[in-house]
Amino acid sequence: MYQLRHKKFVATDLETCWDFFSSPSNLKKITPSYMGFHVKNEIPEKMYEGLMIEYTVTPLLNIPMNWITEITKIDYLSYFVDEQRKGPYKIWHHEHHFKKVEGGVEMEDILSYVLPLGFLGNIAHALFVKSKVREIFEFRNKKVEEIFK
């Protein structure tokens, strides 16, 4: 299993930060356009445990992939977890943590994932998946800074 941990300071209050990140409609705003992110089902303004979000993405070679994510756990103003139910990964478990700190919010993402195809998945991870995942987080960092200026 691979794991990526990423911390980010956001210069806003905890409630504003939580409201932005817990609204599924904002995911597209912090996803690179080349990913072709498109939500396929109706989504509420605010997430809830058990919420299923179906979307397509084109992360590699412009090949569309269907992905279904479930919001499996929410602790209001503290963290939420999304897990892939259908998609390109064998396992995808993404924790989003929020902590009030002086001057704003410290966000921490903890992403744990496993690729399919055994050793071929490990090769793909080394060749491009790891760098692509990091690139997406770097893009999100920049967008979050723009949004919360």
Language-model features, listed with the residues they occupy:
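Hydrophobic ligand-binding cavity/cleft-lining segments
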Residues: 1-48
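Short, surface-exposed coil-to-beta transition loops
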Residues: 3-5, 64-68, 91-94
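Generic structural detector for well-ordered beta-strands
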Residues: 5-11, 38, 56, 70, ...
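Beta-strand elements of well-folded, non-transmembrane domains
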Residues: 10-12, 57-61, 73, 88, ...
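A short, structured loop/turn motif at beta-sheet edges
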Residues: 13-14, 46, 72-79, 97-106
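Hydrophobic pocket/interface hotspot
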Residues: 16-21, 27, 53-55, 71, ...
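Glycine-rich portal/gate segments that line the openings of hydrophobic small-molecule binding cavities
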Residues: 39-86, 139-147
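Beta-strand/loop substructures that line and gate deep hydrophobic ligand-binding cavities in soluble
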Residues: 84-135
